[in-house]
Amino acid sequence: MAKQIIVTDSTSDLSHEYLKQHNIHVIPLSLTIDGKSYTDQADISSSEYIDHIENDADVKTSQPPIGRFIETYEQLAQDDVEIISIHLSSGLSGTYNTAVQASHMVDGNITVIDSKSISFGLGYQIKQIVELVLLQSKKI
């Protein structure tokens, strides 16, 4: 069985330590706050983002460009892995649909999941996938 790698977006609110520990690849969303652009979780934290919302800033989010997904999927697929790509709800963003489109453009074993959730709900699902992957690896 191929090694399984998880890809998600920056809305899961999982700690950087957890993401690194479990080799989870994150494709960040873009944020615009009062006309200034940020990369989610790289240039601005969740708490800073929430502070801006609470202070009535003009806040907009933007899904990652398809090229970011293609680049990530191609890089990971070189190692002949199974990619599990789980993202925030398709009802809130086009991120899931972009991930699906990118998965069809890359020669690899890629499963894209619509979490139907965001933030802690998405993070919880990722943690469950991590547990299943760890359990599966112990059976081999």
UniProtKB/Swiss-Prot annotation:
Positions bound to hexadecanoate: 61, 93
Coiled-coil positions: none
Residue ranges of domain DegV in the record: 4-140
Keywords, ordered alphabetically: Lipid-binding, Plasmid
Recorded GO MF terms: lipid binding
Cross-referenced PROSITE patterns: DEGV
InterPro entries: DegV (IPR003797), DegV_domain_contain (IPR050270)
Role noted for this protein: May bind long-chain fatty acids, such as palmitate, and may play a role in lipid transport or fatty acid metabolism.
Database matches in NCBIfam families: DegV
Protein name, entry field: DegV domain-containing 15.5 kDa protein
Organism annotation: Staphylococcus aureus
